[in-house]
Design a protein with these regions (language model features):
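Secondary-structure transition motif
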Residues: 1-125
Length: 125
């Protein structure tokens, strides 16, 4: 993954919609906010987001070309799996969301079709 591919998504505080972009934490005295910044040709736009919803892009896309983020739930190999960051492996892994849990390194998805069917955050809220 290239440095320009590093991006995040999170839910905006004002309208609860997902927004994608660069992750920015502003610690200016009383203005401490967690924001997602969107940089476009016309300039930058910052959106205050819920810090508990921040998810990192994995560098992968599903069969339909949708970006795969941490916390997404995918349909893969006749089962549902959640994308999770595993500190001990320094990698994104898949964890089964059904009765059995297991870990599979996300790199296996590079050669297999999968579909994003939801995400942990929307499922919980």
């Amino acid at each position: 993954m290239k440095i320009e591919d590093i991006k995040f998504k999170a839910k905006r505080l004002d309208n609860k919609e997902w927004v994608e972009g660069s992750f920015v934490v502003m610690n200016i005295a009383a203005l401490s906010k967690t924001t997602i910044g969107i940089v476009a040709a016309g300039g930058a736009t910052l959106h205050e987001v819920d810090p508990s919803t921040v998810c990192q892009f994995t560098g992968l896309t599903d069969y339909d070309g949708k970006d795969l983020y941490e916390g997404d739930i995918i349909s893969f190999s006749d089962s549902y799996n959640q994308v999770v960051w595993e500190d001990d492996l320094c990698a994104f892994v898949l964890v089964g969301v059904e009765s059995h849990s297991y870990y599979v390194h996300c790199d296996i998805l590079k050669n297999c079709p999968f579909y994003i069917v939801g995400n942990k955050i929307d499922k919980e809220k």
